[in-house]
Amino acid sequence: MAGSGGPTQTGDTIRKPELNLFQIINMSFGFFGIQIGFALQNGNVSRIFQTLGADMSTLPLLWLAGPITGLIMQPIVGYFSDKTWGPLGRRRPYFLIGAILTTLALFIMPNSPYLWVAAGTLWILDASLNITMEPFRAFVGDMLPSKQRPLGYSMQTIFIGAGAVLASIAPFVFNALGVSNEAADGIIPDNVKWSFYIGGAALFMAVMWTVFTTKEYAPEELEQFGKDEDNIFEQEGGIDAAERPESSFFSKWGLIITAFGAAFSAAVYYSNGDQQFYVLGGGLIFLGLLYLFNSGLVKSDRNARNFLSDVLGDLTTMPSVMKRLAVVQFFSWVGLFIMWIYTTPAVALQAWGTADATSGAYQDAGDWVGIMFAVQNGVAALYAFGIAGIARKVGTRSLHAFNLLAGAAGFVGYHFFASQYGLLIPMIGLGMAWGSILALPYAILADALPVRKMGIYMGIFNFFIVLPQILVGGTMGPIMRTLETSVAPMFGGVPLLAILFGAASFCVAAFAMSFVKVERG
């Protein structure tokens, strides 16, 4: 591949060439399309589900598609994309396949005739987005020398913000241009449909731009780069034999986790508990069985190199900083998932005074939520330009805790602003939190991890993004049903009460930051 200069040689090490700005833009532009897909999903799926007959209590369960597919697809795609090579290279085949599937899912989603079709399409959409997105993070490491990687990730952040803003305002803009935001019962409004159509086309073209303008290094080229370039073919990426837990560790914890999951599920059954709790119980049982299966693999060969043993082994031997940061990330994403599920019904109730998903007022609220998310993403994108400099002055740990508290204040602000324009103000705090969550935890983590384990630990760190979403999806509905008549009326209704749960979760995350040890603040 031709960079802005050819490879340079220092001693026995051949270094990657630096790329020029236009090449970095080309390799990052696909993220613009990917974020259009995510933003259309986050801003409109609750609205689509409710239009097709879903009630408030089932929304978290229906939203489980995202975290579950992320938990499954991200490690699989990352693992196999490392081993792929073909005419399009290593990562680009996944960009292409994912973009095609995502575009088809975006075209189908607003035309779903039944709730079960929309729910199934969401599973396909989320899986496809993960196939497309996951290799993009590794793409920066593949293509750029070490000193250009911050620029590469910053460029991705810019395109994340730009794509999210445009997709978020699309339904509002189409309605302003005369495309109706009202439809018959059970039919998705035309302004939402056209947002998905245009968004799907934009996603496909953006990803194709990266696929066809960026040529990857061949395996023999990558093998020439030294360790300082994080040689992806280096065979030292797994955990050391001395660190790998013995078979008895996995069998003991496998039995404990499986038994706890089974006991939890049995308690739900015999107490006639809400069926959504079975999601949590079933997930624990599945994790326990994975531990037991891995116990057999490790017993036969403790040094065996396989996907499951490497992931579970490194999961149990995470560095101390990563363990503490995982707690912060967990509660941060609990709050974010609550925001995505409940913002539309909360805004409809607070500013438009309606809970009727088929009403014109509710559709107006749904359009306005797109504007709110656009403000949030715009603030996050702008904040990303200066957040590194601020962190150097006040300390990364203190800044991230402050940003999370700003996000918590944003959640609380939903209760203090009753007009649609007033509700834009809380999105400033939530935008600061969102920009911080996208950047600072990864900066802290990168400083704490050995380079040879960076990839697998980053993948494991993503578990603490999807696991809280599964927890919210499996428990939030039953919790809100329990509080619907007793507590929720005191706070303006179920969705506004749920928003306060998001504020509390951000506060817990900010408190947990005090236990994270960070060099240079």
Residue ranges and their predicted role:
Residues 131-144, 436-450:
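Intracellular juxtamembrane helix-capping segments at the cytosolic ends
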Residues 72-88, 382-396, 480:
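Helix-to-loop junctions at the C-terminal end of transmembrane segments
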Residues 1-21, 113-116, 132, 146-331, ...:
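Intracellular loop-helix junctions on the cytosolic face of multi-pass helical membrane proteins
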Residues 397-440:
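C-terminal transmembrane helical hairpin of 12-TM major facilitator-type secondary transporters
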Residues 56-57, 146-156, 366, 449-461:
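Loop-to-transmembrane helix entry/capping segments in MFS-fold secondary transporters
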